[in-house]
């Protein structure tokens, strides 16, 4: 599943 990738993107957005 691409859940990991999606989660990573969400985290980066949150940090920004």
From Swiss-Prot:
It comes from Homo sapiens. J region of the variable domain of T cell receptor (TR) beta chain that participates in the antigen recognition. Alpha-beta T cell receptors are antigen specific receptors which are essential to the immune response and are present on the cell surface of T lymphocytes. Recognize peptide-major histocompatibility (MH) (pMH) complexes that are displayed by antigen presenting cells (APC), a prerequisite for efficient T cell adaptive immunity against pathogens. This is T cell receptor beta joining 1-4. GO terms for cellular component: T cell receptor complex. It comes from the Eukaryota. Keywords: Adaptive immunity, Cell membrane, Immunity, Membrane, Receptor, T cell receptor. It is found in: Cell membrane. The keyword Chaperone does not apply. Alpha-beta TR is a heterodimer composed of an alpha and beta chain; disulfide-linked. The alpha-beta TR is associated with the transmembrane signaling CD3 coreceptor proteins to form the TR-CD3 (TcR or TCR). The assembly of alpha-beta TR heterodimers with CD3 occurs in the endoplasmic reticulum where a single alpha-beta TR heterodimer associates with one CD3D-CD3E heterodimer, one CD3G-CD3E heterodimer and one CD247 homodimer forming a stable octameric structure. CD3D-CD3E and CD3G-CD3E heterodimers preferentially associate with TR alpha and TR beta chains, respectively. One of its GO terms (biological process) is adaptive immune response.
